[in-house]
UniProtKB/Swiss-Prot annotation:
GO molecular function: bis(5'-nucleosyl)-tetraphosphatase (asymmetrical) activity; GTP binding
Protein name: Bis(5'-nucleosyl)-tetraphosphatase [asymmetrical]
Cofactor list: a divalent metal cation
Taxonomy of the source species: Eukaryota, Metazoa, Chordata, Craniata, Vertebrata
Organism name: Sus scrofa (Pig)
Keywords of this entry: Acetylation, GTP-binding, Hydrolase, Nucleotide-binding
Protein function: Catalyzes the asymmetric hydrolysis of diadenosine 5',5'''-P1,P4-tetraphosphate (Ap4A) to yield AMP and ATP. Exhibits decapping activity towards FAD-capped RNAs and dpCoA-capped RNAs in vitro.
Ways its activity is controlled: Inhibited by fluoride ions.
Domain of life: Eukaryota
EC number of the protein: 3.6.1.17
Short name of one Pfam family: NUDIX
């Protein structure tokens, strides 16, 4: 049976885009262990929890951002399937916007750093092809909403 995890692709919008036209910035966390990879907050589903409850709990635990500080974006839900630690794993992501651009990020011991990044930089740090694709799809979804 595949391990199941859920998370939120957290983003914020700059009121004034940077020179490279980056108006949307994604929050990535750097793991404290292994290859110190960068991902959005995510974690394993606990018994009795819904997938979205898991994503919200993990975001609070790993980044210190609680559900009241976020707006879940309707219509975007992506599922990744891959092998981690020699076991099949399924991870489900939703998009969530922080209500306060300057929200405080408080990392747990599971992570050693965080960064707010435009799409190109986020894709460079996200080492895994599937993670890059989800970030690109999320960005495209957000841009299509604004059009």
């Amino acid at each position: 049976m595949a391990l199941r995890a859920c998370g939120l692709i957290i983003f914020r919008r700059r009121l004034i885009p940077k020179v490279d036209n980056t108006a949307i910035e994604f929050l990535l966390l750097q793991a404290s262990n292994g290859i110190h990879h960068w991902t959005p907050p995510k974690g394993h589903v606990e018994p009795g929890e819904s997938d979205l409850q898991t994503a919200l709990r993990e975001t609070q635990e790993e980044a210190g951002i609680d559900a009241g500080q976020l707006t879940i974006i309707e219509g975007f839900r992506k599922e990744l399937n891959y092998v981690a630690w020699e076991k099949p794993k399924t991870v489900i992501y939703w998009l969530a916007e922080v209500k306060d651009y300057d929200v405080e990020v408080r990392l747990s011991r599971e992570h050693q750093a965080y960064r707010w990044l435009g799409l190109d930089e986020a894709c460079q740090l996200a080492q895994f092809k599937d993670m890059k694709a989800v970030l690109q799809e999320g960005h495209q979804f957000l841009c299509s909403m604004a059009a």
